[in-house]
UniProtKB/Swiss-Prot annotation:
The gene is SAA1. This is Amyloid protein A. Expressed by the liver; secreted in plasma. Induction: Upon cytokine stimulation. GO terms for biological process: acute-phase response. It comes from the Eukaryota. Major acute phase reactant. Apolipoprotein of the HDL complex. It is found in: Secreted. Keywords: Acute phase, Amyloid, HDL, Secreted. GO terms for cellular component: high-density lipoprotein particle. Pfam families: SAA (PF00277).
């Protein structure tokens, strides 16, 4: 696998995560964030190693932001 293919997978994986986030905002259902986050992770991971990496980075950032804002572990 080439470095460029990894970067392409990561970019597409990040787009998958963004699409899930946008869909969550549009749906506007209470307590639906875990579903949409899981869907984004799954879609990104299907892209390959780059997508898995992007999903992990974005998920870790989400958890760290929630900790910083004082949300408990039940929200992650």
């Amino acid at each position: 696998r080439s470095w460029f293919s990894f970067l392409g997978e990561a970019y597409d994986g990040a787009r998958d995560m963004w699409r899930a986030y946008s869909d969550m905002k549009e749906a506007n259902y209470k307590n639906s964030d875990k579903y949409f986050h899981a869907r984004g992770n799954y879609d990104a991971a299907q892209r390959g190693p780059g997508g898995v990496w992007a999903a992990e980075v974005i998920s870790d950032a989400r958890e760290n932001i929630q900790k910083l804002l004082g949300h408990g572990a039940e929200d992650t």
